[in-house]
Amino acid sequence: MDFIEAHGFSALPIAASQSTNTDKDAYRGVFQHKTAAVLAGLGFIGKSGLFITKEYGSKVRLATVLTDMPLIPSGAVITEGCGTCEICKNACPAGAITGRNYVYGAPRDTILDAARCSAHMKTYKDIGRGAVCGICMRVCPYNRRKRESDAAAD
């Protein structure tokens, strides 16, 4: 932000974890960080509903800075990167992943039943588990490639 503002442009940060919380079952944030990242050419939204990059898989956390600074997208918009893969769908213990490819502008429910995912994890809240199980992240081939490249570097 300092760089942007030092060049005379405005910068408004939007944290990744801000949510509207007006509807306890909406599971939505105040800003669509994943959509913005796709339009910036940084990656794609997978069948799991996770934002995925070729370099880091879904092991990313997004925040956004809105600015009036003229910027060029990092790359071409990737409309889908999962193809026919259904590993996450088949591994999801909640059955929350439909197996459909993400289509820009389509409702999230066409690819992921967020309420079903959340309900599955609520069954484990008494043992101190988090809000998501992460199995879709664990089995994603994009994350596997990252683990293999990390192991090769060691």
Regions found by a protein language model. Give the residues of each.
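Catalytic cores of enzyme domains
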Residues: 1-154
